[in-house]
Amino acid sequence: MALPNQQNVDLPTFKLLIVGDGGTGKTTFLKRHLTGEFEHNTEPTLGVDIYPLDFFTNRGKIRFECWDTAGQEKYSGLKDAYYIHGQCAIIMFDVTARHTYMNIDRWYRDLRRVCKNIPIVLCGNKVDVPSRQIKPKHVSYHRKKCLQYYEMSAKNNCNFEKPFLYLARRIAGDAKLSFVESPEAQIDNLDVESLQLLTVEAGTQPLLMTRISFEFNTLSIE
């Protein structure tokens, strides 16, 4: 479950680069995670926008610092500076626009030139649109480069969190890592009577401080 940015000095944070041609839905995808709303019309990204997205996992809370880069060619000279110290990436194309798929090799080569061996996910967005031009049988680039591939839709939540989960597992080196509900969401699901009983009981108990350790294997960036 993704949550908006919350201040936490000790929170494990990983720089995620999201790249692809303009209009593929990168910003809409991130804002969908951030706000829960689907924005039909978003302004083109100018340079880069950064969105901190928090997820609760079975090993603790983590944050992806998502660098949403501009897809327009006029900003191409700035890409290398944005990519420095990237730890994982998503390459997005639009299944309704053939040229965005044809350009993914350029985005891949740019990432590899700066970030070397970081885990990368390829995402085909807008699968909810009936008039798609790139069918599943046409998508083969990920097999050539040994990338994980997901067909997704920011509009109807198809494979909504899978790119983040895959990248979290790769960075953690833990194939069993899973996303869980936030503690806040679990409390909201309690009925009123149970919540009142817990509140009364808590008032009679001494305060205990606990600490959850969380260790991730970070990738070395050459």
Swiss-Prot record:
InterPro entries reported for this sequence: P-loop_NTPase (IPR027417), Ran_GTPase (IPR002041), Small_GTP-bd (IPR005225), Small_GTPase (IPR001806)
What SUPFAM superfamilies would the database entry show? Answer: P-loop containing nucleoside triphosphate hydrolases
Q: Where is this region: Switch-I?
A: 40-48
State the UniProt keywords alphabetically.
GTP-binding, Nucleotide-binding, Nucleus, Protein transport, Transport
Which GO BP terms, alphabetically? nucleocytoplasmic transport; protein transport
Q: Where is the signal peptide?
A: none
Spell out the PANTHER family in the cross-references: GTP-BINDING NUCLEAR PROTEIN RAN-4 (PTHR24071:SF26), RAN GTPASE (PTHR24071)
* Similarity comment: Belongs to the small GTPase superfamily. Ran family.
What protein name applies here? GTP-binding nuclear protein Ran-4
| Organism, as annotated | Arabidopsis thaliana (Mouse-ear cress)
Q: What is the lineage of its organism?
A: Eukaryota, Viridiplantae, Streptophyta, Embryophyta, Tracheophyta
